[in-house]
Amino acid sequence: MLTFVGLGLYDERSITVAGREALRSADRVFAEFYTSKLAGATVEELQNHHDIDIEVRDRAGVEQEPGPILDAAEAGGAVFLTAGDTMISTTHVDLRLRADNRGIETQIIHGTTAGAAAASLSGLQNYRFGKATTLPFPYAHGGEGVPGSVLDTIADNRKRGLHTLVYLDIKVGTGPRGPDPDHEEYMTADYAAELLAEDLDTVGVAIARAGSPDPVLAADRLSALADRSFGDPLHLLIVPGDLHVVEHDALVALAGAPESALPDPV
């Protein structure tokens, strides 16, 4: 059996009860933290809290050499961990399909996702979100500024009055000069706002440390958000589309948005 367990958003306590039980009953536990991480807990803290040993795999060890994970699942009970949910944004469908091809039973125990938290914290209605996008570091896409695909996604959503959730780049094990096992870099909301404001100085919503006891939420024009600091990672950015009156009021009351920066509600 291979059980995919989402750890949730912040620390060792963010996992569901079902996820915790799966961890403690597993013969072996694997994890990856190159697509996301728990900002409030180290691997050691996870191990100590749940009384388990965790075998952390890098990208190659999951996507190119998954044999040890699959062998463990074939021999007994194996758990594969990620931050958030293992199949949302941080997707590991390929690993699940490889297990299925070997006749290994699989199970998913879901975790809270950044997308769900972004809608909950901001007061923006989740069914008014369009396609999400990821903003990479300029060096990661070999160009300058914001890739056209990111701007196109935001523009297409806005034409339909929809909000855009912008995931911010994470680079673990790879830096500006290529592979680097010591490199760990997380794009901040202020830097993302600065990049986007060069092409689209509209309203943005910055979210930092969703799922923590002290998340930060701020809404303003992107150029104004670029001048602020939002503290430790992980960060997200939302570019709103048309605003319902309740969404408008939520951004003012909950995110401190200046009314002058917001479009009139529809």
Curated annotation (Swiss-Prot):
Give binding positions for S-adenosyl-L-methionine.
9, 85, 88, 113-114, 168, 210, 235
Query: What EC number(s) are associated with this protein in UniProt?
Result: 2.1.1.98
Q: Does the keyword Metal-binding apply?
A: no
Q: Cross-referenced InterPro entries, in alphabetical order?
A: 4pyrrol_Mease, 4pyrrol_Methylase_sf, 4pyrrole_Mease_sub1, 4pyrrole_Mease_sub2, Dphthn_synthase
Pathway assigned to this chain's UniProt record: Protein modification; peptidyl-diphthamide biosynthesis
Keywords for this protein:
Methyltransferase, S-adenosyl-L-methionine, Transferase
Q: Under which main EC class is this enzyme filed?
A: transferase
Q: Which residues form a coiled coil?
A: none
Q: Which reaction does it catalyse?
A: 2-[(3S)-amino-3-carboxypropyl]-L-histidyl-[translation elongation factor 2] + 3 S-adenosyl-L-methionine = diphthine-[translation elongation factor 2] + 3 S-adenosyl-L-homocysteine + 3 H(+)
Q: Write out the GO MF terms.
A: diphthine synthase activity
Give the source's domain of life in one word. Archaea
Biological process (GO), any one: methylation
User: Is Transferase one of the keywords?
Assistant: yes
Function field: S-adenosyl-L-methionine-dependent methyltransferase that catalyzes the trimethylation of the amino group of the modified target histidine residue in translation elongation factor 2 (EF-2), to form an intermediate called diphthine. The three successive methylation reactions represent the second step of diphthamide biosynthesis.
Please give the PANTHER family that the UniProt record associates with this protein: DIPHTHINE METHYL ESTER SYNTHASE (PTHR10882:SF0), DIPHTHINE SYNTHASE (PTHR10882)
Q: Which family does it belong to?
A: Belongs to the diphthine synthase family.
Query: Quaternary form?
Result: Homodimer.
Put simply, this protein is called Diphthine synthase
The scientific name of the source species is Natronomonas pharaonis (strain ATCC 35678 / DSM 2160 / CIP 103997 / JCM 8858 / NBRC 14720 / NCIMB 2260 / Gabara)
